[in-house]
Swiss-Prot record:
Matching PANTHER family: 4-HYDROXY-TETRAHYDRODIPICOLINATE REDUCTASE, DIHYDRODIPICOLINATE REDUCTASE
GO molecular-function term, one example from the UniProt record: NAD binding
Broad class of where this protein is predominantly found: cytoplasm
Record keywords, A-Z: Amino-acid biosynthesis, Cytoplasm, Diaminopimelate biosynthesis, Lysine biosynthesis, NAD, NADP, Oxidoreductase
Entry protein name: 4-hydroxy-tetrahydrodipicolinate reductase
Source taxon at top rank: Bacteria
Biological pathway: Amino-acid biosynthesis; L-lysine biosynthesis via DAP pathway; (S)-tetrahydrodipicolinate from L-aspartate: step 4/4
UniProt key word Transmembrane helix: no
Organism: Exiguobacterium sibiricum (strain DSM 17290 / CCUG 55495 / CIP 109462 / JCM 13490 / 255-15)
Entry's Gene Ontology BP terms: diaminopimelate biosynthetic process; lysine biosynthetic process via diaminopimelate
Enzyme class: oxidoreductase
Binding site for NADP(+): 29
Active site: 134, 138
Binding site for (S)-2,3,4,5-tetrahydrodipicolinate: 135, 144-145
Length: 248
């Protein structure tokens, strides 16, 4: 497998560290790799690759999708902070090439989604709250993974997200789900779903201890994706070995 890394920050470096023989090019405007050719843009890259792993920035999405479509290259998109309009462009592009898009590449988050699918239908009498914690350099809130978990819950229960309560000063409604974000220190990522019932609590929590878990997940996604036809693939379908599907 021949890979290009699009975005050579901390997680991109870990991808290179974990798969040194597979990475044949790095694309980043400000950073270079010593062992392989480095380019400022995808258009400059001369190597042919089986897949591109993207840990860059939403502003680079148009060029990434255009390159993928032009060269028929599968894309693993792990960048966070996309708008709904940008997510729609990913969906549109996936009708032409295989795209794997997830805000969190860890196996544990896929397991957490499966646990929620089991628990949410059973916990109709419980209030649900969602808390995410990240390092003090993260700019988007709530995190993309928190939004992913929210959508998983909403597929099973009619709940509306509430992002702050100070302005309303009203009691909590049964169909609400509180979304809470904390930023500080060097927290890699922590996500917790709280089910609050009468005199009892149920908590599901995932903590990432290193960015390597995201890099490893991206490599596994690339290995699976190069065998697939056009479509938009998710972390959940990869790890549960279900058939691929396009998200409309």
């Amino acid at each position: 497998m021949r890979l290009a890394i699009h975005g050579y920050g901390a997680t991109g470096h870990y991808v290179h560290e974990l798969a040194p023989d597979a990475v044949v090019a790095v694309i980043d405007k400000t950073k270079t790799a010593e062992q392989v050719p480095s380019y400022g843009t995808l258009a400059e890259m001369t190597e042919s690759v089986d897949a591109i792993i993207d840990f860059s920035h939403p502003s680079l999405l148009p060029d990434l999708l255009a390159y993928g479509i032009k060269t028929k290259t599968p894309l693993v998109i792990a960048t966070t902070g996309f708008s709904e309009a940008e997510l729609q462009t990913i969906r549109d592009a996936s009708t032409q090439i295989p795209i794997f898009q997830s805000y969190n590449m860890s196996f544990g988050i896929a397991m957490m989604q499966q646990l929620l699918k089991t628990l949410v239908p059973l916990a109709g009498a419980f209030d649900i709250e969602l808390l995410e914690k990240h390092h003090n350099q993260k700019v988007d809130a709530p995190s993309g993974t928190a939004e992913l978990l929210l959508r998983t819950i909403q597929d099973l229960r009619d709940v509306q997200p509430v992002y702050e309560r100070e302005s309303t000063r009203e009691k909590r409604e049964p169909n609400e789900i509180g979304m809470h974000s904390m930023r500080g220190g060097t927290i890699f990522g922590e996500h917790e779903v709280l089910f609050a019932g009468v005199d009892e609590l149920i908590e599901i929590k995932h903590t990432a201890l290193s960015k390597k878990v995201f890099a490893s997940g991206a490599i596994k996604a690339a290995e699976a994706l190069i065998q697939k036809s056009a479509g938009l693939y998710t972390l959940e379908t990869l790890y549960t070995q279900e058939d691929s599907h396009v998200i409309n």
